[in-house]
From Swiss-Prot:
It is found in: Cytoplasm; Midbody; Chromosome, Centromere, Kinetochore. Disulfide bonds: none annotated. It comes from Mus musculus (Mouse). ATP binds at residues 205-213, 267. One of its GO terms (biological process) is cellular response to leukemia inhibitory factor. A motif (D-box) lies at residues 889-897. Belongs to the protein kinase superfamily. This is Inactive serine/threonine-protein kinase TEX14. Residues 992-1011, 1383-1397, 1404-1413 have a biased composition (Basic and acidic residues). The protein kinase domain is predicted to be catalytically inactive.
Length: 1450
């Protein structure tokens, strides 16, 4: 086992590693260790001998660097590449030179190692040897010099015996003899062995560090591939031709020279005199191209003829076949003036040849990678060759790509390179397809890809995700090729080279067929007549280049050139006039229409060049080429015809005379039409006025040249008749082409302008019609009157609409929104406004519309305002966090003080209107009284039936259910502490099909529920909504706030307006006030108010309609018991009467200090007798007067609102309103079970028309955790009322201790129950499943619900006498929460009430229920104890219900 010597100096590179334990990793490990035996075993297993590590280093590089001689021999024998490039460009030859071991370097040189290669820093192996230290580098440098000297001697013509004696670098190791004495080398390298010249074999191939070569039979030193190696003196400049050089890429230059009397083109590196060291690496490109060109043979690849080495062997030049024209890039962009006409069949023929060369490369496993117009060389007329193979990569069997130079593509070629090549990723066959497609676009549009953008900018653009696109000006078959070929992703480049070649070949056949049948015409307006002389199609003769009349061709070419052409600036200065010159007959025969071109057209063309317009840019150069080539062919045909009839020119003149007037007439007609079209185009729009003026001037200049043949006709003796005709025809063709392009552009402009005008007119009409419909609707709404109720309600009963007269419009003018509600509106609104845009407009029916003020009518961006979120106080707008309880309470009281005065000002007007509407029919009153009496009797006997909660049982709406689709559920808005539901009011429509496409802010439409039960989810989420309606008022306003109780959170009711433009908003309002037959409309109006960033909504709440299409789900936080409580409330009795209040009643502000219950009990065991009702009426009048409405303004909505708020409140004139108050009283007096209370919701809202009772709600520490009540709320509320209640009795404190012991055992069950009742996403899904199961049997009661109902009935039985007492002593109850009334009376009344309630509850509780619900029963009893919560400071589970009524004396 050989060991490498340690490095005395730092190594130029770091050795790479492996991240896994593969065979390749073991190979490198054994190479480091120098273990030859194990290395052979690994190689015999078939591992890749050139496997690389993380630095791109092969095992041979590692072994050579560490000086393992035996391992180097083994790896070379197994075929390892001595010129393998690492990631830094170094090779094993560099490593061997650094190691200082001459035997290792000689072995690598014999295997083909090259001493001329450089790393990325420009260092060759000799430079690496010098870095190893003087002791080790001296002998190594001398060895490399001996190899160089020996190679020079062989090239300079030393005798064959010299190569015969020293045939291997190993013979040069040690003290070098001067080509005489020999040093014994390898036993296999015998100097006496016989060489067989002319036979290429392993023994006849030599290598001394300058490439492998062999001797031919003529004793010619030849590289493999039979490439002669010549000296630099053998290639010289020809005497009969000028020097001609051109660039063949960013670093290479090609020069036409002569070698051995053969005209060749020599390619060499173009470097400055003193290049930077990194530039020295570019010399490797020629070596790589030499290697590839010597191994590849194809007719369309540029043929490499010889390799020229300099005397010092530092420079290398490649000798290729003669290139006559140059690169395609130079023809298209650098010397285009010399080649004004490129025939289409020539272009296609060139592209076919390039495609064939690429197909050959791909078949050999090579990828060009640097294909561009620089790589395409036009060697002769119509003959192209592909070259520039220095960046060629080879695909190996393993799938990897071998890059000889490992040099990145230069930035100058990024304009043609595929995105993966630019980003230095692996190139594939489709990378060459991309570059070939770019060349097709370049040659047909005369524009450099990426508009000549710098390569570095191209890379940045591609990195940002921008890619090259196909030019729309390309002809049809080529546009498809380019569009598919230059796609950014390789997988989308579906067209391969064989397909492209097939399309090009068929297109070329069509060209040739069109040329034979119609020599003067073609599908593209150009001639394809073959020219025997290449000068006609490529303009190569010197006479053609020196011809002054050719300037007009240059000018014609410049008209169509692209603005980014690199040579545009050189053609902008041309002479305005050209003097007529006498041309040779040969030139006249070739260019007949150039001989007699008058000076005015040239001046006209020069003027056009000096003032280009947008229309000129549209004329690309290949279109001008087609036009002009057609003129050339036409002139040639005319010349031949003229020469054929030269014997009788007299007979030919009449035909010419007839032809000229006809041409003049056609041209005059075309001129008039163009001028008329331009004048018409100018009158359409003023947007493109300047551009049209420029186009019109350009047309005038172009057409002005058509009138110039007048002096030509006068000078008939100077010109022949055929030249005049040809002049007319050429001008006609040119102007016709220009006119066609301008016509197309003008037509496109006209079409766009007409569309814009139509859109504006349509929008104006829609705006006018919708404004008129809005005014008509307002008049209809103002005159709408509804009759009072005439009978008891049914399940489908709808309360009538109340209207308020005399309310003025807002100051901003027209920013109120009027909405209507009818059966099924929630479902229709869900279906219509969560679905697609309406396909037709409804003639009648309610449609949402956005408020539009006159100032912002035209601004559609401001029409996306949403209706204000209807919230209770204490809740911020969507997305905002809950404020602190102290801030919420202060804001609530502040809003109450601000609004109480405005409410009182409106109350008398409301009452007067309502009293006028109470003149009911006597028969109707009789029916109502009978119904009330019957209902009361049922209530007394306990037989008052529960209305079914499932609206599907309602018969009147079954037909409507069939025609309506399933609505979408309301998406929740999740706050920090509670989950709020958005409630959307729907608008009544005449037809049942969904209308309108309304986009709602912050709405999620993805959770569409396709089940039928989801129709009711929306309404059930209206948390305690009531609908009192007002009649005969012009502008009813809807001011809604959500009710909240200790068991449910504040329901967030959010009204969304459409986010569509103004047209869509107004069209949904057309005929929106039409009434639906069989139903009564309910009208609401949302008013926007601004007041200290608070959303203030006065609240006559909505009464939930118990019908099939209107009823929807309550909030998910409500339990089944609460659902039943709503359905079994006293609203059935409330709807059955019409008893008025006194007119002198008024409203008075009352501050609520405790959260309220918002639902009435399920049933009442104590019915209301006529006496109790009449006695309660006076109390409730003052209760309603003292009601205040606490609303909060959402800060996220900014409407054109008014500064002051109009507070709308009403005195309810029926038993329905009084019963509603009773309902809230019962709900306040009832002690709900703790497990059904969801204290997570914030409950600090007031309720209008329901009750003025404020419930102080207290929970213990355990109850707070169980119910998720925010502790801040509890502390804030307790501190507020801490000093208002008397101290607790001693007996209550004793019972508290007993209560604590009972709660220990029942705490776990309560926590589980509260957790089940929390509003979570899992609960939402569970509730929806329950709704689905109950939609068939119309039942939603489970075993838990039955138990809850029993608890509720038991609670109601204890409140009978309390209710009567509360109704008879409102003053005392009011004083309970009024701190100004004195604490003595408050303490007395509360102590008496609590003792009485406690006694009655103990008697009513059943013995068997006491054991199972001991903790709950204790809670119900202790919560009514007067003052124990004050001492405990909310630390114990308790709940005090304080009943508050207005003072009648006030």
């Amino acid at each position: 086992m050989s060991r490498g010597a340690p490095f005395p100096v730092p190594c130029p590179v770091l050795l790479g590693t492996f991240t896994d334990d593969s065979l390749e990793a073991q190979l490198h490990e054994y190479a480091k260790q120098g273990n030859c035996v194990k290395l052979k075993k690994i190689l015999k297993k078939g591992v890749c001998v050139d496997a690389v590590n993380t630095q791109g280093q092969s095992a041979l590089f590692v072994a050579a660097l560490l000086g393992h001689v035996k391992l180097v021999d083994v790896l070379v024998d197994y075929g390892s590449d001595p010129n393998h490039r690492c990631f830094d460009g170094s090779t094993p030859v560099h490593a061997a030179a650094f190691s200082g071991n001459q035997w290792i370097l000689s072995k690598l040189l014999t295997a083909g190692g090259d001493l001329r290669l450089h790393d990325e820093k420009g260092r060759n192996p000799q430079a690496w040897a010098l870095t190893a230290g003087k002791d080790r580098s001296t002998q190594m440098v001398e060895f490399m010099q001996r190899c160089t000297s020996h190679m020079k001697a062989i090239i300079q013509g030393f005798s064959y015996d010299l190569l015969k004696k020293i045939d291997s670098p190993q013979r040069l190791i040690g003290s070098p003899p001067w080509f005489g004495s020999l040093i014994q080398g390898s036993p296999n390298s015998s100097p006496n062995r016989q060489l067989k010249p002319g036979i290429i074999s392993a023994q006849n191939i030599y290598s001394f560090g300058f490439g492998k070569f062999y001797l031919t039979s003529g004793m010619q030193l030849t590289y493999p591939g039979s490439l002669p190696v010549i000296g630099e003196k053998e290639v010289v400049q020809a005497d009969d031709e000028p020097t001609f050089s051109f660039f063949s890429g960013p670093y290479m230059v090609m020069t036409n020279l002569v070698w051995n009397r053969s005209r060749v083109t020599v390619k060499e590196l173009n470097l400055p005199t003193r290049p930077h060291c990194s530039r020295l690496r570019l010399a490797d490109l020629l070596i790589a191209e030499q290697e590839h060109s010597s191994n590849l043979r194809h007719p369309n690849l540029l043929q490499l003829m010889a390799v020229c080495l300099s005397r010092d062997l530092e420079k290398i030049r490649l000798v290729y076949e003669r290139i006559t024209v140059g690169t395609l890039f130079s023809v298209l962009h650098e010397r285009r003036s010399q080649f004004p006409v490129l025939h289409m069949e020539v272009i296609v023929h060139l592209l076919l040849q390039v495609a064939d060369a690429l197909i050959y490369l791909h078949s050999r496993g090579f990828i060009h990678r640097s294909l561009s117009s620089y790589a395409v060389h036009i060697v002769s007329a119509g003959e192209a060759r592909l070259t520039n193979l220095e960046y060629l990569t080879e695909s190996q069997d393993s799938g990897a790509h071998r890059n000889v130079t490992r040099m990145p593509l230069p930035t100058q070629l990024y304009n043609w390179a595929a995105p993966e090549v630019v980003l230095q990723k692996a190139a594939t066959v489709k990378s060459d397809i991309y570059s070939f497609s770019v060349i097709i676009q370049e040659i047909l549009t005369d524009s450099i890809p990426w508009n000549g953008l710098d390569g570095s900018l191209v890379k940045e653009t591609i990195a940002l995700g921008n890619y090259l696109e196909a030019d729309v000006r390309l002809p049809e078959p080529y546009y498809d090729i380019v569009k598919s070929g230059i796609h950014a992703k390789q997988k989308n480049r579906t067209m391969n080279l064989q397909d492209i070649r097939y399309i090009l070949k068929n297109d070329l056949k069509e060209f040739i067929g069109a040329q034979k049948t119609q020599p003067t015409e073609s599908p593209r307006g150009q001639s394809y007549e073959p020219h025997p002389d290449v000068n006609i199609c490529l303009g190569l003769t010197s006479e053609y280049q020196k011809d002054p009349p050719d300037l007009d061709i240059k000018e014609l070419k410049e008209m169509g050139s692209q603005p980014h052409s690199p040579t545009d600036h050189s053609f902008l200065t041309v002479k305005p006039t050209l003097a007529p010159q006498t041309l040779d007959s040969s030139l006249s025969a070739q260019k007949p229409d150039n001989a007699n071109v008058p000076s005015p057209p040239a001046a006209c063309l020069a003027e056009e060049v000096r003032s280009p317009t947008a229309s000129q840019d549209s004329l690309c150069s290949f279109e001008i080429n087609e036009i002009y080539s057609g003129c050339l062919t036409l002139g040639t045909d005319k010349e031949e015809e003229c020469l054929g009839t030269a014997a009788s020119p007299e007979g030919d003149r009449p035909n010419q005379g007839d032809e000229l007037p006809s041409l003049e007439e056609e041209l005059d007609k075309m001129e008039r039409e163009l001028h008329c079209f331009c004048e018409e185009d100018k009158s359409i729009s003023e947007v493109d006025t300047d551009l049209l003026f420029e186009d019109d001037d350009w047309q005038s200049d172009s057409l002005g040249s058509l009138n110039l043949p007048e002096p030509t006709r006068e000078a008939k003796g100077k010109t022949s008749s055929w030249s005049k005709t040809d002049e007319y025809v050429s001008k006609c063709v040119l102007n016709l082409k220009i006119s066609q392009v301008m016509m197309q552009q003008s037509a496109e402009w006209l079409r766009k302008l007409e569309q814009e005008v139509e859109e504006l007119e349509w929008a104006q009409k829609e705006l006018d019609s919708q404004c008129s419909s809005l005014r008509d609707a307002s008049l209809k709404f103002a005159n709408a009157k509804f009759q009072p109720a005439v009978g008891p309600p049914s399940l489908a009963y709808l309360p009538p609409v109340m209207q308020l007269p005399g309310l003025k419009q807002p100051e901003n003018g027209g920013t109120w929104l009027t909405l209507a509600r009818s059966p099924g509106n929630e479902r229709e609104f869900q279906e219509g406004h969560f679905s697609k845009k309406p396909e037709k407009l409804s003639a009648c029916g309610w449609k949402p519309f956005t408020q539009v003020s006159e100032e912002s009518r035209g601004d559609c961006s401001e029409l996306n305002n949403q209706l204000p979120t209807l919230r209770g106080p204490g809740k911020q707008s969507t997305g905002e966090q809950l404020p602190s309880t102290q801030e919420a309470r202060e804001s609530l009281e502040k809003n109450t003080n601000q609004n109480s005065r405005s409410m009182a000002s409106v109350s008398s007007e409301i009452y007067a209107t309502k009293s006028r509407n109470n003149e009911d029919n006597g028969e109707a009153h009789l029916k109502w009284r009978l119904a009330v009496k019957e209902m009361a009797e049922k209530a007394v006997s306990g037989q008052l039936l529960l209305p079914p909660w499932n609206p599907q049982s309602s018969a009147p709406f079954e037909s409507k259910v069939e025609n309506e689709s399933t609505p979408l559920p309301r998406p929740p808005i999740r706050g920090p502490e509670s989950t709020e539901w958005q409630h959307i009011l729907e608008y009544q429509r005449e037809n049942d099909e969904p209308k309108g496409n309304t986009k709602f802010g912050k709405m999620d439409n993805s959770d569409c529920d396709k089940n039928k039960h989801s129709r009711w989810t929306g309404l059930q989420r209206f948390t305690g909504i009531r609908y009192p309606f007002f009649r005969n008022h012009e502008q009813p306003e809807q001011n809604e706030a959500s009710q909240a109780s200790c068991d449910t959170s504040v329901g967030t009711e959010k009204f969304y307006s459409t986010s569509s433009p103004i047209g869509d908003d107004f069209e949904r309002f057309q005929d929106s006030f039409a009434q639906r037959q069989g139903y009564v409309e309910e009208n609401f109006q949302i008013r926007e108010i601004f007041e200290k960033n608070a959303e203030i909504l006065t609240k006559p709440q909505f009464q939930a309609i118990q019908c099939a299409e209107d009823k929807q789900d309550e909030t998910l936080g409500e339990t089944p018991k609460e659902l039943k409580e709503k359905n079994t409330s006293l609203t059935d009795i409330q709807d059955l009467s019409s008893i008025t209040y006194d007119q002198d009643g008024y409203f008075k502000e009352t501050s609520y200090k405790t959260p309220k219950l918002k639902h009435a009990p399920t049933s009442a065991s104590t019915p209301l007798s006529p006496e109790s009702i009449s006695s309660a009426a006076s109390h409730y009048e003052d209760c309603l007067e003292n009601t205040t409405f606490h609303v909060k303004r959402g800060s996220t909505f900014c409407w054109n609102g008014q500064e002051a708020m109009r507070t709308l409140s009403a005195k309810f004139t029926t038993v329905r309103e009084r019963a509603k108050s009773l309902e809230s009283l019962l709900a306040s007096s009832k002690s709900l079970p703790a497990k059904l209370t969801d204290s997570k919701r914030l409950c600090m809202l007031s309720e209008t028309g329901s009750s003025n009772v404020s419930a102080a709600f207290v929970t213990s520490t355990h109850a707070t955790k169980r119910k998720s009540l925010p502790r801040e709320l509890a502390e804030a509320t307790s501190q507020q009322h801490l000093d208002e209640l008397p101290p607790p009795a001693q007996e209550l404190l004793d019972e508290i201790e007993q209560l604590k012991q009972q709660q220990v055992s029942s705490l776990a069950s309560h926590e589980n129950t509260a957790r089940d009742l929390s509003v979570t996403n899992k609960d939402k899904k569970h509730l929806e499943e329950q709704e689905t199961n109950s939609s068939k049997d119309s039942s939603f009661l489970s075993s838990r619900e039955i138990q809850d109902l029993e608890d509720t009935e038991r609670a109601h039985s204890s409140l009978d006498e309390d209710l009567e007492r509360f109704l008879q002593s409102p003053e005392e109850n009011t004083a309970l929460l009024d701190p100004t009334k004195g604490s003595t009376r408050e303490k007395k009344n509360k102590d008496q009430d609590v003792v009485e309630q406690k006694r009655k509850k103990k008697e009513s509780i059943k013995p068997e229920r006491r054991e199972s619900d001991s903790s709950l029963g204790t809670l119900e009893e202790d919560e009514l104890k007067p003052c124990f919560w004050k001492r405990l400071g909310w630390s114990e589970p308790s709940r005090i219900i304080v009943l508050d009524q207005s003072d009648l004396s006030d």
